[in-house]
Amino acid sequence: MKNEMWSGRFSGASDELLKEFNASLNVDKTLFNEDIQGSIAHATMLESCGILKKEELDAIIKGLEQVRSEIEQGKFIFDIKDEDIHMAVEKRLSEIIGSEIGGRLHTARSRNDQVATDFKLFVKKSHIELIKLLKELIQTMLEHAKVHKKTIMPSFTHLQHAQPVSFSFYILAYAFMLMRDIKRLQNSLELADFSPLGSCACAGTSYAINRELSAKILGFKDIMPNAMDGVSDRDFALDLLYDIAVIFTHTSRLCEEMILFSSSEFSFITISDSFSTGSSIMPQKKNPDVCELIRGKTGRVYGNLISLLTIMKALPLAYNKDMQEDKEGIFDSVKTAKDSLIILNAMLKEIQINKENMLNACKKGHLLATDLADYLVREKNIPFRKAHFIVGNVVAQAEAQGIDISEIKDLSKIDPVFDEKAMELLNFEFSLNSKQSEGSSSIASVEKQIQILEGFIQNL
């Protein structure tokens, strides 16, 4: 028996294997809200153009709202034979209001532009949700930054001790990464803000429809100006997947450092018991599973980006069934990102900063060496390369004595070029605040950075 809505030109029914293989309902039913939203906008536009009667529009809207309610309440029966969410909703609508009216909804519309519209609406909504979560995470980082302007810790290059900075300066580096993530999402959202609805299969329609009206109802800035591009475009999905991948690049770096900094070897931070797990055999263990999972999920969202890039590679215009595979990766990446940002924010709110351990760590690795070299250049007019060599010798002498250069009692005994004033440099807080360049680690600079971020999130 032929019962597919598109089966008129076929002489026989589809094989059951094809029905199961071809169906996407188990995945795209996530889009039920967007599908109903798009159909209401389309029907409203058709009525305004005289293609639907007012009573037909009223019946369609009432029926679609009933379908929405049934799905939300778990009463809707999803049948794989319906193939996808679009057909499932339309079939149920026709059952409720009759096929004579229900069958008119798809006038001047193809599933090609319908699915592109639904998908874009979901992607737009996801951008806004992710921006909100990133904003909240930045706010948590700012709270730490305000408290820890004088909490001194070592910075690292090559995971070796580099220079003294404040925890405030450190966490602000991540806050600025997240600020760029928000800007990236905003840019992608702007590029996605064009409606494909009304593009139909690929060439538009002979009906005199008003695409601008349906776009306005759905909250789009404008319409896709080329119908073939309208149904073929998945840049908006790729942009979101890329944006999420970069977010995870940043959060995975933070999580890696939280794992390191919470270890016994560092003990810079303590992760709350509420966000730690134990071992099935080792009673003493306290594992940073939240950070490890976010770090692990990074590979997952990278994979979703590569998957869609590969799906879209070399596809001829316009729509191809390959593009049915575009949604699962998006749904997974969006959920993964939202879940990860929520729990990362909650964990960061409760971390304990171990100030004494951070300060003690500064007494290893000769963090003040660069300050000494800069002093020789600035105060003694010594070329930097020569100053670098002189201070390198100071480091070697300190290591021979088994001490850090911050513990040297008299620099002039190592090299007479150093005077009493140079001894003032062997102080971590002095080093921190001696920086004068924009964006540096000094308290004054950190306060400016906090103001920049606060101004940014206030304007979101």
Curated annotation (Swiss-Prot):
<dbReference type="InterPro" id="IPR022761">
    <property type="entry name" value="Fumarate_lyase_N"/>
</dbReference>
<dbReference type="InterPro" id="IPR000362">
    <property type="entry name" value="Fumarate_lyase_fam"/>
</dbReference>
<dbReference type="GO" id="GO:0006526">
    <property type="term" value="P:L-arginine biosynthetic process"/>
</dbReference>
<dbReference type="InterPro" id="IPR009049">
    <property type="entry name" value="Argininosuccinate_lyase"/>
</dbReference>
<dbReference type="GO" id="GO:0042450">
    <property type="term" value="P:arginine biosynthetic process via ornithine"/>
</dbReference>
<keyword id="KW-0028">Amino-acid biosynthesis</keyword>
<dbReference type="Pfam" id="PF14698">
    <property type="entry name" value="ASL_C2"/>
</dbReference>
<dbReference type="InterPro" id="IPR024083">
    <property type="entry name" value="Fumarase/histidase_N"/>
</dbReference>
<comment type="similarity">
    <text>Belongs to the lyase 1 family. Argininosuccinate lyase subfamily.</text>
</comment>
<dbReference type="InterPro" id="IPR029419">
    <property type="entry name" value="Arg_succ_lyase_C"/>
</dbReference>
<keyword id="KW-0055">Arginine biosynthesis</keyword>
<keyword id="KW-0456">Lyase</keyword>
<dbReference type="GO" id="GO:0005829">
    <property type="term" value="C:cytosol"/>
</dbReference>
<dbReference type="InterPro" id="IPR008948">
    <property type="entry name" value="L-Aspartase-like"/>
</dbReference>
<protein>
    <recommendedName>
        <fullName>Argininosuccinate lyase</fullName>
        <ecNumber>4.3.2.1</ecNumber>
    </recommendedName>
</protein>
<keyword id="KW-0963">Cytoplasm</keyword>
<comment type="pathway">
    <text>Amino-acid biosynthesis; L-arginine biosynthesis; L-arginine from L-ornithine and carbamoyl phosphate: step 3/3.</text>
</comment>
<dbReference type="GO" id="GO:0004056">
    <property type="term" value="F:argininosuccinate lyase activity"/>
</dbReference>
<dbReference type="InterPro" id="IPR020557">
    <property type="entry name" value="Fumarate_lyase_CS"/>
</dbReference>
<dbReference type="Pfam" id="PF00206">
    <property type="entry name" value="Lyase_1"/>
</dbReference>
